[in-house]
């Protein structure tokens, strides 16, 4: 690595040390998609990005191991995650199935009422023709004209009833879908509460941390890009941390960590990485629970696109559940090496 890149790396490390929490750093290092998004936002050359990742692995390892009490807490998180995740996974899979079944039911009723409305409209048209025909023939064929007139009016009434019935059926179905979504929301409250109480005061703002992860990643990348440009163009000014952009969302309550820039950067051990992943898994679980049970759009009003909303939520929930399953596999005994 050339001397200029070494200076850049030191500046980057200072920024991560001062402005990025341990949880954010661990998630960035354990999520390849997040890392690639960060590298793209920061506009880092590949060799520089690789060196930075090695240095950040060492920094993260130091942050994880520095506080033994915190390390013990991570071990507790790991054990809790291993114990509770299978049950939570079954519950979440059940919610995914219910969301998809509900979406399918909403779609079927919507298709059925649409077809029925088409039929009722056709009947209504026929009613109009027969009624007009009956009125037109009245002066010439009294008996037949009254039959046609009565038939036309009867069909018209039937069509009106059919149209109203279809509208009522679809409305009732949507209201029921809304109620079921509300029940999902309420049934998940206790699970979310238990998980949040377990994590406790050690992880403030955890939902915000996960919900805003994409924005956080992009923000970190933009700040690193600004640092790089400032270093490459001294006239832009020296590096100054921009705390108002990212802030420090940290379970350690703002604990400052020792600067690690000396010596060759070494990769963090798999054992240390997955211990941190346990805490990250719990944070993501909170986000998954929130995603599964929060039904704002449905509760604000079930519209024709409510089935798509349900499908989208189920798909997003399934993707995050798959990621959590991978973390659970990483945390299995014998995977520390």
UniProtKB/Swiss-Prot annotation:
One MF annotation (Gene Ontology) recorded for this entry:
lipid binding
GO cellular component terms, alphabetically, are: endoplasmic reticulum membrane; extracellular region; membrane
Q: Which UniProt keywords apply?
A: Acetylation, Cytoplasm, Lipid transport, Phosphoprotein, Transport
Where are the N-acetylmethionine residues found in this chain? 1
- Asked if the Swiss-Prot or TrEMBL record annotates the protein with the keyword Phosphoprotein, the reply is yes
Q: Where in the cell is it found?
A: Cytoplasm
| Segments traversing the membrane | none
Question: Which residues are reported to carry the modification Phosphoserine?
Answer: 250
Taken from the record, one Pfam family name reads ApoL
Tissue-level expression reads: Widely expressed; the highest levels are found in lung, thymus, pancreas, placenta, adult brain and prostate; also detected in spleen, liver, kidney, colon, small intestine, uterus, spinal cord, adrenal gland, salivary gland, trachea, mammary gland, skeletal muscle, testis and fetal brain and liver.
Cited function: May affect the movement of lipids in the cytoplasm or allow the binding of lipids to organelles.
Which family, according to the similarity comment?
Belongs to the apolipoprotein L family.
Q: By what name is this protein known?
A: Apolipoprotein L2
Q: Tell me which species this is from.
A: Homo sapiens (Human)
């Amino acid at each position: 690595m050339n001397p200029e890149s070494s200076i850049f790396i030191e500046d980057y490390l200072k920024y991560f040390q001062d402005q990025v929490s341990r949880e954010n750093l661990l998630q960035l290092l354990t999520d390849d998609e997040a890392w690639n998004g960060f590298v793209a936002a920061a506009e880092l050359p590949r060799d520089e990005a690789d060196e930075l990742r090695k240095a950040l692995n060492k920094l993260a390892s130091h942050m994880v191991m520095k506080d033994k009490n915190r390390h013990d807490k991570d071990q507790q998180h790991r054990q809790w995650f291993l114990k509770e995740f299978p049950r939570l996974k079954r519950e979440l899979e059940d919610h995914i199935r219910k969301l998809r079944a509900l979406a399918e039911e909403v779609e079927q009723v919507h298709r059925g009422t649409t077809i029925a409305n088409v039929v009722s409209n056709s009947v209504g048209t026929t009613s109009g023709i027969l009624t007009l025909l009956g009125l037109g023939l009245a002066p010439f064929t009294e008996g037949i004209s009254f039959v046609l007139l009565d038939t036309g009016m009867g069909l018209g009434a039937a069509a009106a009833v059919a149209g109203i019935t279809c509208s009522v059926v679809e409305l009732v179905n949507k209201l029921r879908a809304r109620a079921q979504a509300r029940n999902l929301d309420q049934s998940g409250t206790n699970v979310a509460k238990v998980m949040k109480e377990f994590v406790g005061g050690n992880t403030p703002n955890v939902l915000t941390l996960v919900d805003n992860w994409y924005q956080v990643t992009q923000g970190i990348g933009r700040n690193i890009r600004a640092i790089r440009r400032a270093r490459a163009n001294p006239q832009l000014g020296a590096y100054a941390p921009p705390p108002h952009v990212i802030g420090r969302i940290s379970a350690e309550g703002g604990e400052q960590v020792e600067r690690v820039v000396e010596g060759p950067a070494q990769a963090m051990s798999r054992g240390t990485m997955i211990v941190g992943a346990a805490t990250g898994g719990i944070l993501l679980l909170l986000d998954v629970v929130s995603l599964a049970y929060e039904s704002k759009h449905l509760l604000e009003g079930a519209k024709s696109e409510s089935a798509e909303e349900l499908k989208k939520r189920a798909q997003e929930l399934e993707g995050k559940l798959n990621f959590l399953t991978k973390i659970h596999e990483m945390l299995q005994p014998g995977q520390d090496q």
